[in-house]
Amino acid sequence: MTDEQVALLQDLMFHTVPGDLAAAEASFRADMRTLYGKASKAAKADIAEALAESAIDLRSVLPEWNLKNKSRHGNAVCSQGELDAEFDMTVALLRELGEAEQAKRAEAEAEQIKTSNLARMCRKSLEGEMNTHWGNDYASGLRKAMQKGAILVTTNPVLVDIARKEDPKFWTPVRDALREKHGVSDPVALGYAMTIQVVVANAKLLRPIWEITGHALGYVSLQLNPKEARNAAKMIREAVAVYSQLEEELGGTPNTVFKVPGTAAGIDVASAVTAKGMGVNVTVNYSLPQQIAFAGAIEKNSTAPVSFRTHMDGRLDDPVGEELEAAGVSDWEQVKTWATTAIRQREYTMLCNPPCEGGLGFGKSAPLAASGRGPWNITRTLANGPVTMFITVFPNRQDEFDEKKRQLKPDGMWTPLPKGTLEKLYQSRIFRQAYEPDGMEPKEFISFVPSARTLKQFGDAYDEFLEWMCKG
């Protein structure tokens, strides 16, 4: 689809008064029919894709935000029957135009959304049955994820590098234009310019949700230079500069947050950046000591509407598993999957629960689960507590989670550890460091095994990305 066509679909879903939908859809179909008749082969493909996507939208989660939103429109909302009627007319038009494959795709994807666990999770949260939202843990494919309820997206050097590799026909010309505009003398500045393009494209897709929810949802995470994880001053300068560029690109306050590393320097960055009203997402973060340090800094200093504290589930569980295997724990592969669960239960109890329930009642930053390795990372993160729980999910893990119907328990986070599991986990030094509130001092965060591994991977990917930007 073209950018113009995407904008048309956004208007239909987010900016159309429910009572005007039938007329707006009819006008859209008429325009597409007229354009199709005189279009080139490539343009016809774009039109057919846009028609199919508009049909899928009607049976997706997207209407929940506006067209079916009673808090905005009272009882004057669209019924599912009205949406289905528009779906049928759009699919019929595709077949009339000879685009049977796109018609079949629209029907198939609409059926997939109907049975999607992720879509069901979003709807349950919108209805108040749970308080858990999910996002796309990938730099591309956001619009398809939004159809299943995604309300945020994350980017990091690895993901941006993957995005340009997967779609070189799109991103290579963008890179070439940025080279011509900025030159190649400052690779970091050029890298940020490219990252901003990825972020802005995603931010525009999520911006209506951000507006509708009063800036509570609809954010894009943008990672600061991972090579500067020890340099607070430089990260702060870069955040301020990038934020200014995002304001210009988006025409107002950016619906973005900065990913800051869970290091000692990162604490200073989180304090300074959130004090300026810019949200953060703490990454390279695996432990209760890190969560306590960052939650406290954000709670004390932040004037931003939203910040997140990501826990990188699999990036902790995997090295814990290595230590358990070395210690002779026979069922280490199963035991390691409970490491993050144990930490998350303690974290939420300590930081999110209100004082009357033994917690600190922090509300300026929300916990976010990421880097999951299987369905358990999702089902054991579901919650209905006072602070929203967020999850970002890799595309392949989205498919895995949706491959069969799953029970979505609003209290899934509190699934009890199997008997003896905590004792086995304690045989891992990495787990003990992560689980105990005083397991590490801030100066140790950067050398913590999962942190060191992740920072190296992010740094290597960042170097590869800058190499492509400047010389590729």
In which residue ranges do the predicted regions lie?
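C-terminal extensions of enzymes
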Residues: L9-D20, A24, F28-D31, L35-A48, ...
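N- or domain-start disorder-to-order transition segments that initiate the globular core
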Residues: A85, M89-D137
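Short, surface-exposed connector motifs at secondary-structure boundaries
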Residues: E248-T256, S271-V280, P354-G363
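Phosphate/adenylate-binding glycine loop and adjacent helical scaffold
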Residues: A145
